[in-house]
Amino acid sequence: MKEIKNIIIKIERFQSKKLKFFKENLMENKKNSVIERFAKKGVFPYQFALTLLIPIRNIFLSPQKLIERLELKEGDNVLEVGAGPGYFSLKVAKFLKNGRLTLADIQQEMLDIAKKRLAKRKVSNSEYYLCNGTKFEIEDNKFDVIYMVTVLGEIENQKEYIGEFYRMLKPNGILSISEQGGDPDKMSVEEIEELLKDFNFEFYKLYGTKNNFTI
């Protein structure tokens, strides 16, 4: 009950920021394509970035719960793919007291928002990487953990990306994929398993339900 009250309070504080955000980014932007992309499949438009920071998301998957599922260690080197405005990034970076978090996204505007958000909270162990949609210009065996939340379905060349994840992970590294109901790009557990079968990943754990899960 206390957690629900806290969420309600945070949502109330969120409202004024949200109204200002929509006025600046949507009311002045008359392009229907941006609004259409909000509810359709594909890359989530940065113009709606603030909606990804709404506290009610904690009900489905909080940053703290994700950290537990990732089994992170304080010294890990971690890559977040599709970081967006940094909803999960802030707490993950703070947890990595002796490690580093690289935030990757295909939209520079999203990275700019995340960078500003983390800098405001004095986070200094983060890096930012703009994806080009194909290869990652990152060395082999760099990361202990690579994770993404409601992102995989947005990627067009999924197998190429999975191959890149495998290359960038250290031996015995973890690739974590989370999906949530209501996302138009949501993939099922079975679809993800089918996608991964051509690579040398071993299934480790399934958290949550088939509608909202982390593997």
Question: What are the roles of these predicted feature ranges?
Answer:
Residues 57-75:
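Conserved alpha-helix/loop element of class I SAM-dependent methyltransferases that forms part
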Residues 159-174:
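A short glycine-rich, Lys/Arg-flanked "PGG" loop and its adjoining helix->strand segment in the class I
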